């Protein structure tokens, strides 16, 4: 599971390096931070609103989040709509993400966790339906950088282990380091909205050497409405 529901502002249209049309929107920041840029791949499910929008239009969007595997070094977030995009009369502060998958720590997580005792950074590896335009296959995984705080961070530290299945609800956050043209998008866990499944600890000698358990995540197949136009 890798879904986003959010209010957003229409920014404009463009094409990827391999010629795929997208519509860029800005999702409002929660608290401090920048608006989050998301690129929408138009689908039948989205309806025809995106064809008549002007810059600054307020939208309600919903769908699955992906990365673009077709272009190396493309770190943008892409949304495949699963429901009709609505035109709103005013901006709404909605930014909700649900991610389910396998717990994982990469080198950046480990480094970040050394600087704070109240924060725990980790990665969730999840699966998603095939999206040929983004070169995403059923066997591919999508990684989401996640930040948890205080009680949630402590609980995850005590009960999570590599490969353990979990589900979180949170919001997208964007951060661009000083002097950099590239921003980083992560998910921040909302207080108390994290659940883990399966055994709390691995059995002795059963350590996971690679994130193979992602395949255990249940995937809902895409409908005809989710297919790109």
Predicted segments with their positions:
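OB-fold and OB-like beta-barrel modules that bind single-stranded nucleic acids
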Residues: 4-11, 55-67, 82, 98-105, ...
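Short, charged/polar low-complexity linear motifs in solvent-exposed/disordered segments
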Residues: 78-79, 173-174, 185-187
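Generic structural detector for well-ordered beta-strands
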Residues: 9, 39-41, 102, 123-125, ...
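A beta-hairpin/wing motif
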Residues: 23-27, 121-124
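Acidic, gly/ser/pro-rich intrinsically disordered tails
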Residues: 1-5, 13-20, 29-33, 37, ...
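Extended, hydrophobic interaction surfaces within ordered domains
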Residues: 24-86
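Beta-rich strand-turn-strand
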Residues: 44-69, 146-180
């Amino acid at each position: 599971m890798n879904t986003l529901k959010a209010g957003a502002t229409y920014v404009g249209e463009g094409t990827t390096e391999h010629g795929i049309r997208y519509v860029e929107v800005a999702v409002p920041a929660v608290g401090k931070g920048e608006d989050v840029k998301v690129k929408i791949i138009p689908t039948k499910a989205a309806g025809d609103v995106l064809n008549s929008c002007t810059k600054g239009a307020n939208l309600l969007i919903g769908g699955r989040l992906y990365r673009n595997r077709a272009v190396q070094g493309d770190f943008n977030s892409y949304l495949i709509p699963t429901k009709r995009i609505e035109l709103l009369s005013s901006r709404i502060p909605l930014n909700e993400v649900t991610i389910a998958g396998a717990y994982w720590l990469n080198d950046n997580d480990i480094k970040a966790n050394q600087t704070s005792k109240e924060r725990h950074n980790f990665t969730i590896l999840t699966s998603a339906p095939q999206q040929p335009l983004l070169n995403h296959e059923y066997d591919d995984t999508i990684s989401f950088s996640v930040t948890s705080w205080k009680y949630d961070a402590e609980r995850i530290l005590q009960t999570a282990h590599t490969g353990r299945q979990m589900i979180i609800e949170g919001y997208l956050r964007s951060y661009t380091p000083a002097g950099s043209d590239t921003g980083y998008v992560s998910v921040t866990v909302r207080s108390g909205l994290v659940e883990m499944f399966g055994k709390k600890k691995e059995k002795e000698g059963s350590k996971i050497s690679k994130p193979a358990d992602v395949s255990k995540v249940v995937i809902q197949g895409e409908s005809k409405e989710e297919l790109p136009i």
